[in-house]
């Protein structure tokens, strides 16, 4: 009989504590890439909504790789990114205790769906948010505040909100977040932020193909889970008294308390997580009917698969396609940020050459890429049906 091992590395990382539900549904972006004054002023983050996953076929162009000049199939995630609206500017002063906000400048008009974010129940509220601001708005006072930011501040950020009315989701309240302006001098940053007030910003003005980005979001909620699923500890033998899906020993006699490092049952999922260095494979236009076409597949087809993305629907706006998976379930709002750690390895610098994007149905085993291809296979003629209905 072989001997048993009496030592093993601990199960469950201590770097992700406490494992409880996050207070923020949207990914919080509390740090931004390092500023480079030599570049032009630009925004560093955006928001998107997870639509679903599919797969692509591409040719690897990375010398030294064993897959170089070969075709590979990779999983990708499609994130719908409707345009965001800039409604404010915030200036920060760098103090010994960190950044401190000097003042906030709001645009003249604020969308009602944005005002709803300041109330728990918009229908039963007095709806007085920003009424005094809009009634007594003064352009000269706004310019004075912007000059004050230009004089005293070292960090400039804009206040942006999503446009939920452009999405087919139940959520109607717009998500609000701050986006840092990097590049140029402070005066150029303030002028750039002022030029964006009350205007829509599209995702292709911030991110580009072959770029690396970070994804900040909240994971899927799993509810109350035991130690086997929550920490991955090994279950006990089958003859163990009073259950075997548990921890055999929760600690010594003394100290006479349970340490925080001991795996215990509790909340699993709905945690805030940051995934770094995701490769952008495509930045697509929502109004382009052939935004899923490639050089190797010239078929006119959209990124939405047949039948729509499961539990999401049709992608009608601009979108970003990134390599691999990302946090959260379908419809979860994600914060996309420019990579905070510059990457210089071969995979980061590789130019992506897509040959094929799969748009078959994700409900079951899809075999057709377009509706026309499916109709041709089954011998259907949709023109006759349309003529019959018109008669």
Curated annotation (Swiss-Prot):
Q: Which InterPro entries match?
A: L3_arc_euk (IPR045077), Ribosomal_L3_dom_3_arc_sf (IPR044892), Ribosomal_uL3 (IPR000597), Ribosomal_uL3_CS (IPR019926), Transl_B-barrel_sf (IPR009000)
* GO terms, biological process: translation
Q: What are the boundaries of the region Disordered?
A: 1-41
Please give the GO cellular component terms listed in this UniProt entry.
cytosolic large ribosomal subunit
Is Ribosomal protein among the key words of this record? yes
Keyword Cytoplasm found: yes
Q: What is its subcellular localisation?
A: Cytoplasm
List, as start-end ranges, the regions of compositional bias called Basic residues. 17-31
PROSITE patterns tied to this protein:
RIBOSOMAL_L3
Keyword list, A-Z: Cytoplasm, Ribonucleoprotein, Ribosomal protein
User: Could you tell me where the Basic and acidic residues compositional bias lies?
Assistant: 1-10
Tell me which NCBIfam families the record gives: PRK04231.1
The record's section on PANTHER family has:
60S RIBOSOMAL PROTEIN L3-RELATED, LARGE RIBOSOMAL SUBUNIT PROTEIN UL3
- Similarity section: Belongs to the universal ribosomal protein uL3 family.
Q: What is this protein called?
A: Large ribosomal subunit protein uL3
Q: Which organism is it from?
A: Tetrahymena thermophila
């Amino acid at each position: 009989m072989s001997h048993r091992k009496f030592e093993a590395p601990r199960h469950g990382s201590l770097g992700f504590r406490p494992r409880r539900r996050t207070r923020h549904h949207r990914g919080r972006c509390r740090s931004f890439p390092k500023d480079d004054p030599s570049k032009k002023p630009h925004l560093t983050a955006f928001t998107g909504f997870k639509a679903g996953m599919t797969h692509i076929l591409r040719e690897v162009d990375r010398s030294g790789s064993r897959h170089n000049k070969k075709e590979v199939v990779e999983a990708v995630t499609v994130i719908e990114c409707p345009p965001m609206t800039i409604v404010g500017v915030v200036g920060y002063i760098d103090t010994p205790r960190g950044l401190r906000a000097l003042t906030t400048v709001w645009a003249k008009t604020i969308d009602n769906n944005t005002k709803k974010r300041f109330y728990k129940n918009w229908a039963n509220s007095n709806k007085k948010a920003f009424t005094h601001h809009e009634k007594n708005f003064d352009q000269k006072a706004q310019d004075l505040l912007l000059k004050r930011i230009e004089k005293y501040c070292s960090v400039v950020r804009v206040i942006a909100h999503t446009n939920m009315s452009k999405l087919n989701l139940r959520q109607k309240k717009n998500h609000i977040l701050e986006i840092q302006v990097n590049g140029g001098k402070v005066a150029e940053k303030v002028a750039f932020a002022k030029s964006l007030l009350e205007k829509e910003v599209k995702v292709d003005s911030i991110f580009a193909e072959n770029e690396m980005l970070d994804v900040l979001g909240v994971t899927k909620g799993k509810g109350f889970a035991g130690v086997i699923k929550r920490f991955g500890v090994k279950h006990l033998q089958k003859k163990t008294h009073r259950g075997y899906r548990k921890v055999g020993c929760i600690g010594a006699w003394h100290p006479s308390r349970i340490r925080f490092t001991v795996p215990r049952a509790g909340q699993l999922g709905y945690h805030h997580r940051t995934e770094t260095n995701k490769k952008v494979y495509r930045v697509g236009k929502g109004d382009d009917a052939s935004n899923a076409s490639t050089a190797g597949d010239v078929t006119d087809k959209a990124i939405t698969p047949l039948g729509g993305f499961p539990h999401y629907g049709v992608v009608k706006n601009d979108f970003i396609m990134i390599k691999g998976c990302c946090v959260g379930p379908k419809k979860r709002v994600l914060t996309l940020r420019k990579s905070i750690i510059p990457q210089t390895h071969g995979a980061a610098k590789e130019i992506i050459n897509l040959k094929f994007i799969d748009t078959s149905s994700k409900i079951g085993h899809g075999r057709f890429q377009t509706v026309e291809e499916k109709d041709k296979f089954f011998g259907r003629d949709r023109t006759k049906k349309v003529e019959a209905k018109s008669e």
